[in-house]
Regions:
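A short, conserved alpha-helix in the catalytic core of glycosyltransferases
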Residues: 1-11, 16-47
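Short glycine/serine- and small hydrophobic-enriched flexible loop segments
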Residues: 8, 30-33, 73-77, 95-98
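Hydrophobic side chains within alpha-helical segments
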Residues: 26-29, 73-74, 90, 102
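Short secondary-structure transition/capping segments
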Residues: 28, 51-54
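Catalytic core of nucleotide-sugar-dependent glycosyltransferases
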Residues: 38, 56-83, 105-121
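Catalytic beta-strand/loop signature of glycosyltransferases that borders the donor
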Residues: 38-51, 59-60, 86-87
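Non-catalytic, C-terminal membrane-associated alpha-helical segments of glycosyltransferases
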Residues: 82-151
Length: 151
C-alpha cells in the first residue's frame, strides 16, 4: 500500500525503467532518501503469476537485458555519494571485460541501452539531489541493519 500524496510527491513510477523492473525499488529508495518510512511485510502473500504479463510482451533475453539496463539507470539516477559513484564507474569496465572474456554480451548490450536513457537519468539525478535528506551510505546502512527490508 502506498500513501497517494507521497506517491505523487515522488512523481510516481519513473518511466525511465519502462517497460519493466526497478520501478518499485526506485520509488522506495527515493522515499527513504527523503526520510519517509518504507515497510516490508515478509509474511504477506501476494499472488502474482511470475512474468505473466511481461513474458507476453518480452522474451526472456530481452527481460534480462532490460533488467541489467535498469540497474545502470538506477545507479546513475539515485546513487549520489561520490565514493559509491566512483566504485560503480570502476566496476563498469570490469563487468564489460569479464563478459568479453566469457564471450557474453549481456552487460555490453545493456550498457549501450542504458546510455540512450542516460540524459533522462542524469536529469532525474539533479532532482533527487535537491530532495535527498539522507546519504546513500545512510540508506544502505539502514537497509543492511534493518531486517525489515530483507527476506
Amino acid at each position: 500500500m502506498v500513501d497517494r500524496e507521497r506517491y505523487l510527491d515522488l512523481g510516481g513510477f519513473d518511466n525511465l525503467y519502462h517497460p519493466l523492473y526497478y520501478e518499485e525499488i526506485d520509488l522506495s529508495y527515493r522515499a527513504l532518501k527523503r526520510g519517509w518510512e518504507v515497510h516490508y511485510e515478509p509474511k504477506s502473500t501476494a499472488y502474482h503469476k511470475v512474468q505473466s504479463t511481461i513474458t507476453k510482451q518480452e522474451k526472456k533475453r530481452s527481460i534480462e537485458l532490460i533488467s541489467a539496463r535498469n540497474n545502470y539507470l538506477f545507479v546513475w539516477k539515485n546513487i549520489l555519494d561520490p565514493s559509491l559513484t566512483l566504485q560503480f564507474i570502476i566496476f563498469i569496465p570490469l563487468f564489460l571485460i569479464r563478459d568479453l572474456f566469457k564471450f557474453k554480451s549481456r552487460f555490453w548490450i545493456a550498457f549501450f541501452m542504458a546510455l540512450k536513457r542516460m540524459p533522462a537519468a542524469l536529469k532525474s539525478r539533479k532532482e533527487e539531489k535537491l530532495n535527498a535528506l539522507f546519504s546513500d551510505h545512510e540508506i544502505l546502512r539502514k537497509i543492511n541493519i534493518n531486517s525489515e527490508y530483507r527476506t
